[in-house]
């Protein structure tokens, strides 16, 4: 069976770190308030010259280097982002150009915080179908540029960053993407959204969120989709070595783990240092755990996320 195997990971963060204490100097909040409600202590904010595509390119370079291949080997680039450099062209094509990659398939996917899972699923399908051999899948965001910095209920939650994986088609063996599951429910599109856009206000807009409603749906949906994808893979929750979740809020991570009966020590947590980086959060957390040695070859991983729309999804991967 032809499978998409993860052969390299990479990540990138802006130069500037912003602690809760620094944020509290300009926003009506405090370190204690943020930590108690979210678990977040730090985030990274893009500065001059740093964009979604530059962060994506840096993460991609590291993933390609880790994979031990040349950029020219990449035949497919999918970039998940809700904060592209421009309305068009796709930021994936900017990454392609920056990496010096010639003719290939390159496009963006937009499913907000679950965008990386959507992009991974598409890449997996294309590899299984034979239309790609090496794929670069990236999640990258600069949410700092769509935040209302006077709204303490949202601006404290988000950060900027990028994460990337290189997938390679391999025949036989038990490594690779075992199963993916995706969902969307547009009835809830006004619970987490940006109040602007080219065809409506002709502005970028600012992020708006009804936090308690999002929390309630997130815990239920994430637990559900994790069970679904494990069933699709013919495995159980007990088989999981590591869950790599979307890093939205420490309380969501803890509540989801409890609902599934998962020990907290099997959940990769980076939200304290990176905050919510939307589509970047899953590949960013994955890269951190690969590079610090927690995730090892042969481990069974479940990646999961939920974002605005609502959209949500999960992937079971034998690393």
Curated annotation (Swiss-Prot):
InterPro entries: ACP_syn_III_C (IPR013747), ACP_syn_III_N (IPR013751), FabH (IPR004655), Thiolase-like (IPR016039)
Broad class of the protein's primary localization: cytoplasm
Keyword Lipid metabolism found: yes
This enzyme's EC code(s): 2.3.1.180
A UniProt-annotated Pfam family: ACP_syn_III
UniProt catalytic activity: malonyl-[ACP] + acetyl-CoA + H(+) = 3-oxobutanoyl-[ACP] + CO2 + CoA
Disulfide-linked positions: none
Stretches for region ACP-binding: 247-251
Annotated GO biological process: fatty acid biosynthetic process
Entry's localization field: Cytoplasm
Gene3D superfamilies in UniProt: 3.40.47.10
One cellular-component annotation, GO: cytoplasm
One function term, GO molecular function aspect: 3-oxoacyl-[acyl-carrier-protein] synthase activity
Entry annotation: catalytic residues: 113, 246, 276
CDD domains: KAS_III
Enzyme class label: transferase
Notes concerning its domains: The last Arg residue of the ACP-binding site is essential for the weak association between ACP/AcpP and FabH.
Subunit-level organization: Homodimer.
UniProt protein name: Beta-ketoacyl-[acyl-carrier-protein] synthase III
Native source organism of the sequence: Rhizorhabdus wittichii (strain DSM 6014 / CCUG 31198 / JCM 15750 / NBRC 105917 / EY 4224 / RW1) (Sphingomonas wittichii)
């Amino acid at each position: 069976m032809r499978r998409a195997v993860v052969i390299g990971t990479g990540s990138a963060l802006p130069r500037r770190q912003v602690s809760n204490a620094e944020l509290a100097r300009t926003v009506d909040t405090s370190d204690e308030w943020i930590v108690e409600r979210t678990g977040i202590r730090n985030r990274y904010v893009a500065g001059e010259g740093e964009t979604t595509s530059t962060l994506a390119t840096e993460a991609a370079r590291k993933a390609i280097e880790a994979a031990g291949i040349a950029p020219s080997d990449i035949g497919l680039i999918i970039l998940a982002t809700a904060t592209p450099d421009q309305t068009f062209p796709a930021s994936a094509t900017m990454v392609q150009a920056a990496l010096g990659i010639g003719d290939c398939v390159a496009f963006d996917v937009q499913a907000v915080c679950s965008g990386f899972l959507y992009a991974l699923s598409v890449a997996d399908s294309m590899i299984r179908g034979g239309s790609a051999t090496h794929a670069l899948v990236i999640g990258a965001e600069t949410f700092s540029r769509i935040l209302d910095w006077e709204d303490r209920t949202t601006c404290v939650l988000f950060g900027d960053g990028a994460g990337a994986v290189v997938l390679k088609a391999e025949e036989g063996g038990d490594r690779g993407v075992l199963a993916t599951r995706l969902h969307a429910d547009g009835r809830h599109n006004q619970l987490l959204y940006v109040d602007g856009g080219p065809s409506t206000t002709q502005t970028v807009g600012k992020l708006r969120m009804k936090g308690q409603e999002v929390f309630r749906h997130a815990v239920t949906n994430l637990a559900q989709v994790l069970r679904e994808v494990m069933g699709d893979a013919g495995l159980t929750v007990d088989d999981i070595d590591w869950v790599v979740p979307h890093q939205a809020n420490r309380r969501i991570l803890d509540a989801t783990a409890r609902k599934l009966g998962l020990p907290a020590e099997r959940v990769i947590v980076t939200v304290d240092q990176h905050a919510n980086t939307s589509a970047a959060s899953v590949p960013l957390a994955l890269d951190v755990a690969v590079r610090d040695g927690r995730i090892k070859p042969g481990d069974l991983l479940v990646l999961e996320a939920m974002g605005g729309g609502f959209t949500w999804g999960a992937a079971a991967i034998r690393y």
